[in-house]
Amino acid sequence: VPSPLMTRIVNEAVDAQELNARITEIVAEGTPLIEQAYYDDGTANENERIVTFLYQHATAEQVLIFVNRLTDEKNLPLSLMERIPGTDWWELSFQMRTDWRASYNFIPTLPGERPIWLGEDDQVTLRTALDSGEGDPLNPKTVCNRIGRCMGVVELADAPVHEFLLTQQELDSLPEPRWMTTADGHQYLLG
C-alpha cells in the first residue's frame, strides 16, 4: 500500500535535491512514518494505519526489510524495498492494525554481492541471515535480537503495554547485579 505522504512529496518535488531535502525533513521526526488509513470511500479507517519504513543507503542495489512476524520467509520479494527515484532513500509501506508491534531491520545488498537471503533452503541459515541486518538509525525504539543486533521497534497507538521493557535511562539507573560463585564455578544472580 503506498504512503500518501511519500506519494505526495515525490509528485510535488521539482527536482531530486528538493525531494532529498523533504525526505530529510520528514525523517528528522523519526521513523517509521505512521499515517491514517482510509477506506475506498474516503472515510477514515480507525482500526488501521499505514506504516512506511524509510532507509537511506547510497550504494545498495537492493534492500530487504525483515519485519518480525510479518516478513514471509518463503516469499521474501514481498519485503524488498523500493528506491525513491533520484535519492539514496528506500521505502516500503504496510497497512497494519492499530494494535501492531514488531521489530525490524534492513538488509542491503551492495553492487556485485549476492543477496544473503537467496538460496538458503534451511531455516536456520536463512534466519541467521535475516537476523544480521542493520537497525533503524532514525528510530530511538530498539530491541536486541538473539544474536545481539539492535533492531528497530514499531508500535502503533493501541499496541499492548510491554511492562517489562525499560528505556535506556531506566536501564542505566538499575543497580549493578550481584553474583554468587560456587566452588565448582557456577554463578547465580542474587536478589
Please tell me what each predicted stretch does.
Residues 1-55:
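Non-catalytic, glycine-rich low-complexity segments
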Residues 45-47, 52-98, 109-182:
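Aromatic-rich carbohydrate-binding modules that target alpha-glucans
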Residues 99-103:
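Extracellular Ig-like/FN3 beta-sandwich strand-entry sites
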Residues 106:
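Acidic/His metal-coordination segments adjacent to aromatic residues that form catalytic metal sites
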Residues 183-191:
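A short loop-to-beta-strand scaffold at the N-terminal edge of the catalytic core in hydrolase folds
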